[in-house]
Amino acid sequence: KCGFGLTGIIFSAKLQIFKIKSTCITVKHQNVKNLIDCYRLIKNSKYLYNQNTFVVDYSKNNIFLGRVFFGFFSKKEFNFRKIKDNEIYNLRLGLFNLNFIKISIYKISFLIEKLINIFSNKKHINDILFTSNKKTIYFNLMPNKFIEYQNIVPEKKVDNYLKEFERIIVKHKPKITLIHLKKFNENGKNFEFKKRGLAIAIHIVIDENFNAFYKDLTNLDLKNKCIINFYKNSLADLEFLKKVYPTYSKKFIKNIKKINKRYKFSNSIFKNYF
């Protein structure tokens, strides 16, 4: 009863070897028991790989192994694999030997990433570990009735939100195929609001348990003044929009009416490959 999406069609692949002293980066496993522990782990870690996902299931004993984080909600057993920054004592660049006196990565937070960029032609560590990241097409293999729900929970309300979120999952037992948690920090330059907190993405199958769960979920978001991603939520109506974005709803509705209904989506990838 637990499905999950498949990401990627690899058109080309290239093997890359990346070498850096083992004293700089280590991998550490850490177990957590609930969503609040997940949030605190994300919030307090200097560097976590960007995809932290797990599968929710109530009937199977299978383990879904992701890139970083795997486990089942019903068992309350999850495992993070995180990248840990250590202290640099010695670094070799070609024929030169540069000695550092216990330079702390914690104090110089971007040093490791800059060094990685130097050695890998300005590529991020995610692209080093998974070289096909930028050569993929995302598609889902979920059931026909399926939506993705995204929101941003304000920082001060995260703990209470996650407790209630777990409660309504246990209460309604929806088919959730993926939950994505990500620390959110925006200063307002790219958005018309300023928020710090937790960004959540949920893949939900629309079945007999969906309506009751969705109603409680949207009420929970309104209660905690969460920001909803209406681009992803195809079920949201204008009344819900007005409650979430009271300041911008009139402007949004006005511009929606200007959209040309005859416009059809087109993409060069589909023209070339399908």
What are these language model-derived features?
Residues 151-204:
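C-terminal structural cap/anchor segments
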Residues 55-56, 84, 176-183, 228-235:
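A generic structural motif
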Residues 128-147, 179-198, 264-274:
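N-terminal flexible segment immediately upstream of the FAD-binding catalytic core
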Residues 1-167, 175:
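C-terminal substrate-binding/cap subdomain adjacent to the FAD-binding core in PCMH-type
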Residues 169-177, 219-228:
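A common structural junction motif
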Residues 163-168, 213-221:
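Short amphipathic alpha-helices in soluble, non-transmembrane regions
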Residues 209, 226-274:
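Activity-critical C-terminal alpha-helical subdomain
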Residues 64-74, 121-126, 186-197, 239-249:
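Short glycine/threonine-rich loop-to-helix capping motif typified by GTGT followed
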